[in-house]
Amino acid sequence: IARRQEEGILHDYLENSLLALTDWIANVFRLAKRLEAYEGDAVLQRDLKALPKDIQNAEARLRLENDESVRREIRQVIASKKAQKQNLEQLQDVMEKAEMQLENSLTALGTVYSQFLLLDAKKIDDARARGLAQDIRDEVDALQNVVTTMDEVYGRTI
């Protein structure tokens, strides 16, 4: 579409929009790969399921234990397992938000695609093209923020 436009402001906006769209698609791909890695991580999934029961078992053992040095060790195990559970729950929350952002981005990509087709069909004015370009930049920035947050949280947890 941008190549078919005559040189000028609209052409420049469309070219810039296409570059931003490329970044957007790259971020969508990175986000999808990160989600796929998370969902395929058997250790994380196993720990998410096992930790509540492990904590309960350790707390039950603590109630039955009389030796103070063993009780101290059990308390440390419980604290460690609770911290691990909290970190995994935070990771799970981030991943759920990322999944919603991915879904939102894919929907927005479909919208942008149809807007580009409208641009071509109607040869709309520069103001609308500027608005579309800004929408794309905003979506790219939002998705980049999610990917960066996921990189930080996922990298810190594993």
Regions found by a protein language model. Name each.
Residues 60-158:
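Long amphipathic all-alpha helical oligomerization modules
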Residues 1-71:
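Membrane-proximal, non-transmembrane interface segments of integral membrane proteins
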